Swiss-Prot record:
Its main location: cytoplasm. It comes from Thiobacillus denitrificans (strain ATCC 25259 / T1). Coiled coil: none annotated. One of its GO terms (biological process) is tRNA N1-guanine methylation. This is tRNA (guanine-N(1)-)-methyltransferase. One of its GO terms (molecular function) is tRNA (guanine(37)-N1)-methyltransferase activity. S-adenosyl-L-methionine binds at residues 116, 136-141. Its EC number is 2.1.1.228. The keyword Hydrolase does not apply. Disulfide bonds: none annotated. Pfam families: tRNA_m1G_MT.
């Protein structure tokens, strides 16, 4: 799999590329990454990538032309590898990112992560070049880099070979439409709180049953919307 990020702040992606599971997966060749700075696709001496919005208002907007040129360069390089790009833009107006969508996107051969800044991007560029808009939630961030990092991390951990224990991804929250169950490690008693006895029983069927019940309990208490959705999907 290949990720290409169109971003003014490529160094932010070091958080994924240099640490943990995503670093090991990169070292194992499970995915590739390349960043593209829109400033490299400008003509003026100041490498301008933003301007004032028509109609007035606060802040600046990213210009369409440098982003369009950057995306053309990405597309050309991907075409040389017979890869078709899927361009994702991160925006509060996008559809909320879910584990189901992560699982679908991980099968894409090439994702282009378009990271906006300032007050956003000229709408004409979005209409012409973007395949999908994604949101992490109903809040505003300073740019698209953090959502892009979150998406990369979520996808990479699902790639075969990324996790040392293949069952870890299958047990993640949302993988079965529910929150994950509670987990415990040593010592058996910590500050007067003991590990549930069933987890020490060695009875795998009982442990699996307990974990499923706990997932249902937590989901019902903390995210009843997920439980309703899972029940609806099961009926259909």
């Amino acid at each position: 799999m290949r990720f290409d990020a169109v971003t003014l702040f490529a160094e932010m992606f070091d958080a994924v590329l240099d640490y943990g599971i995503t670093r090991r997966a990169l070292d194992r060749g499970l995915y590739r990454f390349k960043s593209w700075n829109p400033r490299a696709f400008t003509d003026d001496p100041h490498r301008t990538v933003d301007d004032r919005p028509y109609g007035g208002g606060p802040g600046m907007l990213m210009l369409a032309e440098p982003l369009d040129r950057a995306l053309n360069a990405v597309q050309q390089e991907l075409a040389s590898e017979n890869l078709a790009p899927w361009v994702v833009h991160f925006s509060p107006r996008g559809r909320p990112l879910t584990q189901q969508r992560v699982m679908e996107l991980k099968d894409m051969p090439a994702l282009v992560l378009l990271c906006g800044r300032y007050e956003g991007i000229d709408e004409r560029l979005l209409q012409r070049r973007v395949d999908e808009e994604v949101s992490l939630g109903d809040f505003v961030l300073s740019g698209g880099e953090l959502p892009a990092l979150a998406l990369m991390d979520a996808i990479v951990r699902q790639l075969p070979g990324a996790l040392n224990d293949a069952e870890s991804a299958a047990q993640d929250s949302f993988s079965a439409g529910l929150l994950d169950c509670p987990h415990y490690t040593r010592p058996e008693v910590w500050q007067g709180m003991a590990v549930p006895q069933v987890l020490k029983s060695g009875n795998h069927a009982a442990i699996a049953k307990w974990r499923h019940e706990q997932s249902l309990r937590l989901t019902g208490a903390l995210r009843p919307d997920l439980l309703e959705r899972a029940q609806h999907d099961e009926r259909n």
